[in-house]
Amino acid sequence: MQFNSITPFPENDDELHLTELVYWASSGEVAEVEKSLANGVDVNSTDDEGYSALQAAAENGYLDVVKLLVEKGANVHYKGEYTALQLAEMAEQVEIIEYLKSL
């Protein structure tokens, strides 16, 4: 989740229930994303709100994480409220928009 973005940020920590993979993807932590995937975490897992790691990385501008997740089989067409591409477009993440459109 990105501050001041389309995706609503919870008012307090009790409302925040990110999975490990979504958390690391939203932080741009490539090594931690790789470790989570190596430990068997489903690349398409979502948090309680249906927010995926690919959506998190795309919205927050982490192209390296987006590419890694796609290489590992992330569903680029998955749509919770928005697709990863739609979130990248709303957040004006140009490189990620171009990459996702090229797939």
Tell what function each PLM region has:
Residues 32, 64-65, 95-96:
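Conserved ankyrin/ankyrin-like repeat signature
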